[in-house]
């Protein structure tokens, strides 16, 4: 599976890592551990599907917050777009369920905005390819597939 990040995801993860005193400092490791421990078919076929089309799905994945030792249902929500036709997965957003930056759920308009932004960034070749085995290290700054 090839992993990419959108601008919204990079902004979300940056905001969370700056709030280390609020218990979010493990977010990068937790995302990498969650994605690295799942096989491609699981990432495509399971989890909470938010939207499903012929060529892609938008999925919500519960990610454990290892720093706060919370159960997955109280930790992070990772929103991603995954192709059903290729090995491409784009991280769209992440947010905590609890804490000062906690969000209960994203609205339909927010999901629509994330999808539109990702499609625009794909066309403009500004998605970043990352390595989930190396703490989301950027492999390619401006890429398209």
Model regions and ranges:
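N-terminal targeting/export leaders
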Residues: 31-43, 55, 133, 141-145
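Residue-level signal for secondary-structure boundary elements
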Residues: 21, 39-43, 123-127
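Enriched for short, Lys/Arg-rich terminal
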Residues: 66-145
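A short, surface-exposed loop/turn module that caps and links secondary-structure elements
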Residues: 39-69
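Acidic side chains
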Residues: 30, 40-44, 48, 99, ...
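N-terminal "first-domain core" detector
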Residues: 1-37
């Amino acid at each position: 599976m090839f992993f990419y990040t959108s601008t919204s995801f990079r902004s979300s993860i940056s905001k969370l890592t700056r709030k280390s005193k609020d218990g979010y400092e493990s977010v990068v490791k937790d995302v990498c551990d969650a994605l690295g421990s799942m096989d491609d078919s699981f990432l495509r076929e399971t989890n909470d599907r938010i939207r499903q089309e012929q060529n892609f799905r938008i999925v919500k994945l519960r990610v454990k917050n290892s720093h706060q030792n919370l159960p997955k249902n109280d930790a992070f929500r990772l929103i991603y777009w995954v192709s059903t036709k290729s090995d491409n997965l784009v991280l769209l957003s992440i947010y905590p369920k609890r804490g000062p930056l906690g969000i209960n759920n994203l609205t339909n308009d927010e999901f629509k905005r994330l999808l539109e932004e990702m499609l625009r960034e794909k066309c403009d070749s500004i998605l970043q390819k990352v390595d989930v085995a190396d703490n989301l290290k950027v492999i390619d700054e401006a890429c398209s597939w």
